[in-house]
Amino acid sequence: MKRLIFMGPPGAGKGTQADIIKEKYNIPQISTGDILRAAVKNGTAMGIEAKKYMDAGDLVPDAVVIGIIRDRLVEADCANGFILDGFPRTVEQAKALSEILKELHMELDSVVNLDVPDEELVKRLLGRAIKEGRSDDNEETIKNRLHTYNTKTLPLIDFYKATGILRQINGLGSMEEITNTILKSI
């Protein structure tokens, strides 16, 4: 059983690595964006609430996101573990997640943080933007995303370091090397 969080800045390879690890352990990869869209599509109470904000182009408030995460964690496929990808993004969300897990009699096993230098992230994201034809992902936008990550999400590293479950992973190297490092650490 593996209950994991994958963290790291945009372009670090969280989604790619989470995809590989979820197959190995046969556990769901839970992406905040995906479950928000699914909750809206399924017309759940939290989904209806989230839709109001999404339709207005606003950020969905923590209370709604946390409610949707809680609803997702009680589903049967999470009984043997899960990977949270893109959540939590703030210390407040991490504290709320701890409360949810306590309430559900669950504990996190590891928080995997993929560490990649900003210059490499910019290079990767610009390459991905060109490959996927995303003209809105220019260098300035990317640097803004990294700045937001560094100010809002980076404090989570200290939060999880204090719990003893943080696994710092060098995000440079081949996909296989990074996967093997993650597997050894969790």
From Swiss-Prot:
Catalyzed chemical reaction(s) = AMP + ATP = 2 ADP
Positions of region (LID)? 127-137
Annotated segments matching region NMP: 31-60
- Which CDD domains does this UniProt record tie to the protein? ADK (cd01428)
Quote the subcellular location field of this record. Cytoplasm
Q: Entry's InterPro entries?
A: Adenyl_kin_sub, Adenylat/UMP-CMP_kin, Adenylat_kinase_CS, P-loop_NTPase
Q: What is the uppermost EC class here?
A: transferase
- Name any Gene Ontology BP term: AMP salvage
Q: Does the keyword ATP-binding apply?
A: yes
GO CC terms for this protein? cytoplasm
SUPFAM superfamilies in alphabetical order = P-loop containing nucleoside triphosphate hydrolases (SSF52540)
Gene Ontology MF term list: adenylate kinase activity; ATP binding
Q: Which residues bind ATP?
A: 11-16, 128, 173
Provide the residue positions that the database annotates as binding AMP: 32, 37, 58-60, 86-89, 93, 134, 145
The family note in this entry says: Belongs to the adenylate kinase family.
Instruction: Please quote what the entry notes about the protein's domains.
Output: Consists of three domains, a large central CORE domain and two small peripheral domains, NMPbind and LID, which undergo movements during catalysis. The LID domain closes over the site of phosphoryl transfer upon ATP binding. Assembling and dissambling the active center during each catalytic cycle provides an effective means to prevent ATP hydrolysis.
Protein's name in the database: Adenylate kinase
Native organism: Leptospira biflexa serovar Patoc (strain Patoc 1 / ATCC 23582 / Paris)
